[in-house]
Amino acid sequence: MIHPDVRDVRLETQGMRRPVVGVIGNAYRIENRFATQMVGERNLRAVAEVSGALPLMFAGCPEITDIGALLDTVNGVVLTGARANVHPTHFRTEPHERHEPYDQHRDDVALALSEACVARGIPLFGICRGLQEMNVAFGGSLHPEIRELPGRMNHRMPRLENGEIHPDPTVVFADRHDVNLVPGGAFATLLGCQTIRVNSLHGQGILDPGERVVIEGVAEDGTIEAIRIADAPGFALGVQWHAEYDPQRNPINRALFQAFGEALLASKGRA
């Protein structure tokens, strides 16, 4: 059920087909044996319920996903968060087993897709790993353990004393730190404020921004949390936090998915 405070972008699509959004899949093995692709339901619900679009999962596997054909089919793309990290060879760093798992098939799709979306003006929204992929696609680098940099907080998800993930999603996705937005920037304008508070569930983070990557928001400890791609003809924003968490009620995440939905309608109208 859509929260009553959410302005339903789907109302704007009455009498026309809803925009279609490609949501990237992540590699997963059922019982550690059977290869599959999966997407977290929160991502799908955010696209459907707040952006007002039809979510369509596509494989994060270059042997399956033809990027040109995909972009001829969808009106926008969401690069979701994922457990696997971007492989360090994409930004000239040696891999290490403590930073595994990696998903190089998704890397191959997401990096090429980021450039293709921007080149074609197709709305692109990167979340957590998706922000990192956008940065690497445009020549940037990542640090595999942000918490090891001087003065940085631990941005990883909360865990129990035994190391297991906390079972309560309200604890896992609780707002944990502020993000200061660039005055007059895209995010400050979109959200109508200078400071927001967000969740934090990541180990890697941006070290060096890519050539066209514009920093739009920074955490209290200096970690880059929001970006846009300079001179992109369409929506091309990325966030380090998990904006897919409860955008039906969270005003910051809701505003982002609504803006993405509006960009989809505008892009669809130009098609």
Regions found by a protein language model. Give the residues of each.
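N-terminal beta1-alpha1 cap of cysteine-dependent amidohydrolase-like domains
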Residues: 1-125, 135-143, 147-191, 203, ...
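Conserved G/P- and acidic residue-centered "switch" motifs that form tight phosphate/ATP-binding loops
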Residues: 128
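The feature captures the ABC ATPase H-loop/switch
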Residues: 131
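Catalytic cores of DNA base-excision repair glycosylases
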Residues: 194-197
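A short, structured beta-strand/loop element
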Residues: 233-235
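Active-site-proximal beta-strand elements of phosphoester/diester hydrolases
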Residues: 237-240
